[in-house]
Structure formats: structure tokens, C-alpha cells
Amino acid sequence: MSLTLRVLATDQNVFDGSADEVILPSTTGQLGILPGHISLLTAIDIGVLRVRANGAWNSIALMGGFAEVDADEVTVLVNKAELGSSIDAAAAETAFQKATIMVAGMEGQPSSPEKLKAQQQLNEARARLQASKTAD
């Protein structure tokens, strides 16, 4: 018995296939989904979705959205997504370092739209970097 996983971004169908296990980055923490899981709807945080299929793990960087689990079908609707195997690890590392420096430079400043945007860029860069390093 397996799951059917669909990961849909606003501009593309990122993944559509079978999976033995899915780990979602929900806003309340990591959420493991196996065949027979109870139906649910959850918010997805910026992070890495992990998929186990045929004994191999694959990663997908997600940039926030929603996931629905119903009758062994997992549908993930996100703002942006990228397969870990298609991410340039060196470029992801550079983007992460730049975002870290930007956020560190704003330390101690009051909250502002610029500071929130910098924090979001850091979270997205971290997700892309993690997905690139855990890709099989």
C-alpha cells in the first residue's frame, strides 16, 4: 500500500507520484504521513518536504502553503517549490550566507517590512540549502 503525492506550486506541477512515506514541514512541526493516515488539512511552513519512494529519500524545498491528506492521497499546494535534486548546492550555500549576513545586520532593530522580508529570505535560503544537501 502506498500514498499518492502531488506537490503543486502556483506555476508548476513539482511532483506527482507514489510514495511510501511523506514528511511535511507543517507550521506546528514535522508531520509524518504513512498509508492509512487520518484525513487532515494543515498549513505548510517554509521548509523541506521529504518523500520516501522505493527505499530512496528525495527532498523538495517548500515556500509555505497548505496540505491535505485524504484516503491515501496527499496534496500539497504551495507558493513555490523546488526539487532538491535540481538545486545548485553551491548557489544555495551562497544565498544562505548572504541572507544570514543581512539578517544579522538588522539585529536589534525594531520590526519593519524590510526586516521581515530579510527573515523570510533567510528561511527560504535555508530550505533550499537543506533540500539540496538531502537530495539523493
Swiss-Prot record:
The keyword Hydrolase does not apply. Pfam families: ATP-synt_DE, ATP-synt_DE_N. The keyword Membrane applies. It is a peripheral membrane protein. It is found in: Cellular thylakoid membrane. GO terms for molecular function: ATP binding; proton-transporting ATP synthase activity, rotational mechanism. SUPFAM superfamilies: Epsilon subunit of F1F0-ATP synthase N-terminal domain. InterPro entries: ATP_synth_F1_dsu/esu, ATP_synth_F1_dsu/esu_N, ATP_synth_F1_esu_C, ATPsynth_dsu/esu_N. Residues 106-136 are annotated as: Disordered. One of its GO terms (cellular component) is proton-transporting ATP synthase complex. Keywords: ATP synthesis, CF(1), Hydrogen ion transport, Ion transport, Membrane, Thylakoid, Transport. Produces ATP from ADP in the presence of a proton gradient across the membrane. F-type ATPases have 2 components, CF(1) - the catalytic core - and CF(0) - the membrane proton channel. CF(1) has five subunits: alpha(3), beta(3), gamma(1), delta(1), epsilon(1). CF(0) has three main subunits: a, b and c. NCBIfam families: ATP_synt_epsi (TIGR01216). Belongs to the ATPase epsilon chain family. This is ATP synthase epsilon chain. It comes from Synechococcus sp. (strain CC9605). The lineage of its organism: Bacteria, Bacillati, Cyanobacteriota, Cyanophyceae, Synechococcales. The gene is atpC.
